[in-house]
Amino acid sequence: MKIARCVLYGLLLTWISACHGGNTVTTNLVGYNHTDKDVGHFTVDGNEGGFLQAHRGGGGFTCCISVLDPWRPGLKVKVGWTDDYDENYQERVVEIPKYDAKRTGQFSVHFLRNGEIKVFVPLGGLGGPDYPLKGPEAGLYPGEDPVEVWKHGRKGDQK
């Protein structure tokens, strides 16, 4: 009877592990606000990301968030946030683009000027040579090139 029970528990644990779909890797959570308004606070799947001042981000990390290893198509997270008065809570489900769980440094959330929210699991930060967000939407200020900011720093406030 004990052997049958142990076998049953072993099968149950195997089944639960298969449903989970793999191991996880824990990394820091960081936000970037590309908009003109503060984000009162944001969350990713219930993990608190904190306050984001307009046109700021990347300077503060919160611990921690787990991502699946390995990545697989269709992975999504629920991003929640409030407005600059910490009111009007909203949520959006966002797909996680492909990442290499062996080369992660942070889980990045971007609140973009066009209203989109994008997430990435990169090794480095915004403006770094391999950072996935590029082009006009990448700058924290309109017209700003984060690669130049990453290389030389921000030359004063552009407000």
Residue ranges and their predicted role:
Residues 1-8:
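Bacterial N-terminal signal peptides that target proteins for export
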Residues 11:
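Flanking scaffold residues of small Cys/His-coordinated metal-binding clusters
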Residues 14-18:
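C-terminal motif of bacterial Sec signal peptides marking the signal peptidase cleavage site
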Residues 20-22:
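Bacterial signal peptide processing site
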Residues 29-38:
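Structural motif
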Residues 42-88:
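Tryptophan-paired
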Residues 82-159:
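Beta-strand-rich cores of mature extracytoplasmic or soluble domains
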